[in-house]
């Protein structure tokens, strides 16, 4: 049974997926040079590619933004074809269990599942965060759809500016990172959902069009379990490239680890949002995941790699083929990833090639 659609779907043909999130950064500001990949002397992880989950209903995936596991071990896929935006598979990724919440987001970005089985999803264009129960029914929406405003540290204005990822601590506080770089939303949402919707024909018709905010106000925010805003910290760069605060996780010791993709670094905070240290990784810090044994994994975006890290940021192992692999069966963009509880299966959301990759242990 489908959950109620939140945004009206307009009929039409499903076009070919368009690569990327919001397209290239709007400036020619140089970014840090990548490290050598794979890292010298670091072993390849003992994985191979398995059979990819097939999109349902005779559709093609749009750009696949995110993957996550439910407490039962089922696979959830969040992609940018509005007709099949959320899909649930069995643990093997071979059987479709349901398709739900069509067109809940204009630009699906992150998908996380908390310990209670609630599904959290961000829409980086409409500037909202959804909390859904396991059935896909809306429990909470934070943000104002299609709106943003200048930040005030005195009080949260109730608006996000490109929310990108969510993480949870042991007390059920949750943390949101925002700020994809460029304007919010982008001047041309070509890179939004790959199925026609009402605002697509006239991008200026998206609710009350948010003001153009250069750099999109990169920020880490803390909320309590009821959704009450607690605190925030700016992650903007004083000079150099725009910050792209693309991912966040909570470590086994309760630290917050934020991936700044544009700067290719990890920034570590305590639960009070005090900055503790930075780790220059040298790879695109696109996706972070903490496995059931407390291990840290990183998807390196268009570097085409998945890394196993220690909690000092050191690379312990790698898998993939270096580069943005648009013409191969390798990883095009490791936008988000999810590791099974037994550590034997990893699913990768490839937003460039518009499919879900399955990595199986040898």
Language-model segments: residues:
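A short helix->beta-strand "capping" segment at the edge of beta-propeller domains
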Residues: 36-60
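A short beta-strand motif characteristic of beta-propeller blades
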Residues: 51-57, 95-101, 140, 150-156, ...
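Beta-rich, blade/repeat-based domains predominating
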Residues: 59-72, 103-118, 147-171, 218, ...
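Conserved beta-strand positions in repeat-built beta-propeller and related beta-rich domains
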Residues: 77-81, 121-124, 176-180, 210-214, ...
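Blade-loop segments of beta-propeller domains
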Residues: 84-118, 124, 323
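A short loop-to-beta-strand structural motif that recurs across blades of beta-propeller domains
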Residues: 85-87, 128-130, 218-221, 265-267, ...
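Short loop/turn segments that connect beta-strands within beta-propeller blades
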Residues: 89-93, 133-137, 224-228, 270-274, ...
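Blade-level signature of beta-propeller repeat domains, shared across WD40, Kelch, NHL, RCC1
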Residues: 331-362
């Amino acid at each position: 049974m489908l959950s109620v659609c939140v945004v009206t779907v307009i009929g039409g043909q499903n076009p070919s997926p368009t690569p990327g999130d919001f397209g290239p950064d709007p400036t020619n500001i140089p970014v840090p040079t990548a490290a050598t990949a794979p890292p010298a002397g670091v072993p390849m992880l003992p994985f191979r590619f398995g059979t990819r989950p097939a999109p349902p209903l005779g559709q093609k995936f749009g750009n696949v933004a995110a993957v996550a596991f439910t407490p039962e071990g089922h696979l959830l896929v969040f992609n940018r074809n509005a007709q099949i935006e959320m899909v649930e598979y069995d643990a093997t990724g071979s059987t479709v269990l349901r398709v739900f919440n069509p067109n809940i987001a204009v630009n699906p970005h992150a998908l996380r599942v908390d310990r209670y089985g609630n599904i959290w999803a961000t829409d980086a264009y409409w500037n909202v965060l959804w909390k859904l129960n396991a059935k896909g029914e809306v429990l909470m929406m934070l943000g104002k759809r299609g709106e943003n405003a200048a930040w005030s540290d005195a009080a949260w204005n109730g608006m996000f500016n490109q929310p990108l990822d969510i993480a949870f601590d042991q007390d059920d506080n949750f943390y949101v990172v925002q700020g994809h770089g460029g304007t919010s939303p982008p001047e041309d949402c070509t890179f939004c959902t790959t199925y026609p919707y009402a605002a697509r024909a006239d991008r200026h018709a998206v609710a009350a069009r948010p003001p153009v905010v250069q750099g999109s106000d990169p920020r880490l925010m803390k909320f309590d379990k009821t959704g009450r805003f607690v605190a925030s910290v700016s992650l903007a760069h004083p000079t150099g490239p725009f910050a792209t605060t693309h991912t966040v996780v909570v470590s086994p010791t309760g630290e917050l680890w934020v991936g700044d993709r544009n700067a290719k670094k990890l920034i570590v905070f305590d639960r009070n949002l005090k900055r503790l240290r930075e780790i220059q990784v040298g790879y695109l810090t696109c996706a972070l995941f903490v496995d059931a044994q407390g291990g840290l994994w990183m998807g390196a975006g268009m570097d085409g790699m998945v890394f196993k890290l220690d909690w000092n940021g050191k690379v312990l192992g790698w898998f993939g083929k270096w580069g943005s692999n648009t013409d191969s069966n390798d990883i095009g963009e490791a936008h988000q990833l999810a590791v099974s509880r037994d550590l034997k299966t990893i699913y990768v959301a490839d937003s460039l090639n518009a499919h879900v990759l399955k990595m199986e242990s040898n």
